Regions:
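Conserved short alpha-helical segments that host acidic/polar catalytic motifs at enzyme active sites
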Residues: 1-177
């Protein structure tokens, strides 16, 4: 169903997520949150329900189990983009004269540089970090202790056969437009 696609909305929060949250149903019950769409099954909704319930408090993210790199906007703070990295998924920032870019891989930021003719200072965000960005700068940095799940090794950002090539081709097409 369409509600299972990103971006995902929960109340005032809308976001995107790379990874898998394994305790999503438990968290929705704990926070007395009904799914926005009754037939929705996407695990990412739990991240945004927690963010909505806690007003994007870093400590609340410790309740999430699984792999996570996520970005969201909260209508109560519309000028701020929140970026969070738990475990198992990478999150990269690229700072340039035109602002801050984020992606799951350094390679994606390099594609942005190449096709948008930018120079970015790239860095990987540390696990257990919540960033609040506004007007091209980091407004706040908060730390949290993400829960480790069964496999503590980072999952590859690209997993499906041909996914890398497909993603790069789509990025190049978007950049050329």
């Amino acid at each position: 169903i369409a509600a299972n696609n990103h971006p995902v909305r929960h109340g005032p929060v809308v976001g995107i997520h790379n990874g898998i949250i394994t305790n999503d149903e438990e968290l929705l019950v704990r926070h007395d949150c009904a799914r926005v769409e009754p037939r929705m099954t996407v695990d990412s909704e739990a991240i945004f329900a927690v963010a909505a319930h806690s007003h994007s408090d870093a400590a609340a993210l410790e309740a999430l189990e699984g792999a996570m790199a996520a970005a969201w906007l909260d209508e109560r703070e519309p000028e701020v983009v929140h970026l969070a990295r738990g475990v198992g998924r990478p999150l990269w920032l690229g700072r340039g004269a035109d602002g801050i870019f984020f992606a799951s891989t350094k390679l994606a930021l390099e594609v942005v540089e190449r096709y948008c003719h930018l120079s970015l200072r790239k860095r990987e965000v540390r696990e257990g970090t919540l960033l609040a960005l506004t007007e091209g700068r980091v407004l706040r940095t908060s730390r949290f202790h993400p829960r480790r799940y069964v496999d503590p090794d980072p999952l590859p950002a690209i997993r499906a056969p041909g996914e890398r090539e497909t993603c790069l081709s789509r990025l190049a097409t978007l950049a050329a437009a």
